[in-house]
């Protein structure tokens, strides 16, 4: 009896110690890894990298650099960008996403 209790306790403790990865993919694509430029955007007009006009979030969650760029191009010929601040279609301080 004691052996089975010890065995059960061992299995439970090892199961509780195992890291939970959930449904996330460890190789998932994060297009905006900069310190400030954390907001992925699809923009029409770039003004010297300081301001971008007619911007909004990508139509789908980016899974790769080519998919992010293709989804923005398909959404009215926009460019994939990573911006610091976006409000009402105006995005400020934008850079190119990782891999593009």
Curated annotation (Swiss-Prot):
It comes from the Eukaryota. GO terms for molecular function: toxin activity. It is found in: Secreted, Cell wall; Secreted. Induction: Expression is higher in mycelial compared to yeast-like stage. Disulfide bonds join 32-82, 42-72, 43-55, 83-94. Pfam families: Hydrophobin_2. Gene3D superfamilies: Hydrophobin (3.20.120.10). Keywords: Cell wall, Disulfide bond, Secreted, Signal, Toxin, Virulence. Changing residue 16 to L: In strain: P1. GO terms for cellular component: extracellular region. Residues 1-25 form the signal peptide. The keyword Membrane does not apply. The keyword Glycosyltransferase does not apply. Aerial growth, conidiation, and dispersal of filamentous fungi in the environment rely upon a capability of their secreting small amphipathic proteins called hydrophobins (HPBs) with low sequence identity. Class I can self-assemble into an outermost layer of rodlet bundles on aerial cell surfaces, conferring cellular hydrophobicity that supports fungal growth, development and dispersal; whereas Class II form highly ordered films at water-air interfaces through intermolecular interactions but contribute nothing to the rodlet structure. Homotetramer. Further self-assembles to form highly ordered films at water-air interfaces through intermolecular interactions. Belongs to the cerato-ulmin hydrophobin family. This is Class II hydrophobin CU. It comes from Ophiostoma ulmi (Dutch elm disease fungus).
């Amino acid at each position: 009896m004691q052996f089975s209790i010890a065995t059960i306790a061992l299995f439970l403790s090892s199961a509780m110690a195992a890291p939970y990865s959930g449904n996330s993919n460890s190789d998932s694509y994060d297009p905006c890894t900069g310190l400030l430029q954390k907001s992925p955007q699809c923009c029409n007009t770039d003004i010297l990298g300081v301001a971008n006009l007619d911007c909004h979030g990508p139509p789908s969650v980016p899974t790769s650099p080519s998919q992010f760029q293709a989804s923005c191009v398909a959404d009215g010929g926009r460019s994939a960008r990573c911006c610091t601040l976006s409000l009402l279609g105006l995005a400020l301080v934008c850079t190119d996403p990782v891999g593009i």
